[in-house]
Every structure is written in C-alpha cells, then in structure tokens.
C-alpha cells in the first residue's frame, strides 16, 4: 500500500509579489527551496493563511538570499503581497518507508529568512521562535 506523505513545507512565508501576467508558478528564494528539498518544476500546494485560499502550482527558482515568494499567473488573483502562506509538497511512498519518513520543515521570519528546520511540534503557537500575526 502507498501513502501520500508531506515531503516539504515552508511555514508562514510572506508573499513578496503577485505577477498576474507571468505564465504560472511560484517563485521561491533558492535558499528556501534547497532547505525544504523542493526542486524546480515540482508541484507545490499553496495555502494562504491570510485569506484562506488554497491552490496548486509548481516551483521555480528565485534569487538566492532575496526572500522572494512571488505567486505568478492566474493564481496571483488569489493572494496579495504581505499575505502569509504555507508552501507544501507531497510524495507517495510505500507504507514501510512512510512509517519512518520525516518531512523537511522550514520556518521563516517575516523577511522569508530561514529561522530553523526541525520537526513539527504540536502547539506551535507557544514556541518563541515562531512569530504569529493575526
């Protein structure tokens, strides 16, 4: 039996741009792509924490160290600069592999600089390293 598992997550990144006239995708700072094990053209889910929209697109490389998180193409109508988003990718794997699987989770600050990469912890709102905005 195969299971669909979370492979990668960039948690609460800040949208820096929305380019309606680009052909599609999400541009992600290359540092964040590497830290989260997301490769160019990989399918990703985008969950907008600010407005609740959810959609799927694919990742393309942004300038390393720039903090860029730019939603491109038609999906640009679903977000606004400064929205907080979660970027996730998934992988299918056999049950035995899934049991031991640990996803790459990347937590960022409000400039999309990596704060840490670690396991997800229940009750994250109490962690000092995570800055929650309402």
Swiss-Prot record:
Record-linked Gene3D superfamilies: 2.40.40.20
Main location: cytoplasm
Keywords recorded for this protein, A-Z: Autocatalytic cleavage, Cytoplasm, Decarboxylase, Lyase, Pantothenate biosynthesis, Pyruvate, Schiff base, Zymogen
Pfam short name (any one): Asp_decarbox
Coiled-coil ranges from the UniProt annotation: none
GO aspect biological process, one term: alanine biosynthetic process
EC top class, as a word: lyase
Enzyme Commission (EC) number: 4.1.1.11
GO molecular function, one term: aspartate 1-decarboxylase activity
Cofactor: pyruvate
Compartment(s): Cytoplasm
This protein's record includes keyword Cytoplasm: yes
Signal sequence, start to end: none
PANTHER family the record matches: ASPARTATE 1-DECARBOXYLASE
Family according to the record: Belongs to the PanD family.
Functional summary from the UniProt entry: Catalyzes the pyruvoyl-dependent decarboxylation of aspartate to produce beta-alanine.
Oligomer and partners: Heterooctamer of four alpha and four beta subunits.
HAMAP family: PanD (MF_00446)
NCBIfam families per UniProt: panD (TIGR00223)
Name of protein: Aspartate 1-decarboxylase
Organism: Geobacter sp. (strain M21)
């Amino acid at each position: 039996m195969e299971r669909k598992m979370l492979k990668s997550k960039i948690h609460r990144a800040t949208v820096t741009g929305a380019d309606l006239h680009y052909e599609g995708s999400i541009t992600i700072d290359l540092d964040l792509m590497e830290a989260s094990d997301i490769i160019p053209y990989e399918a990703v889910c985008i969950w907008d924490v600010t407005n609740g929209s959810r959609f799927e697109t694919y990742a393309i490389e942004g300038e390393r160290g720039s903090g860029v998180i730019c939603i491109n193409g038609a999906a640009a109508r679903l977000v606004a600069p400064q929205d907080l988003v979660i970027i996730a990718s998934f992988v299918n794997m056999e049950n035995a592999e899934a049991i031991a699987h640990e996803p790459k989770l990347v937590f960022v600050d409000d400039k999309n600089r990596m704060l840490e990469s670690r396991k997800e912890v229940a009750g994250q709102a109490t962690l000092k390293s995570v800055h929650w905005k309402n």
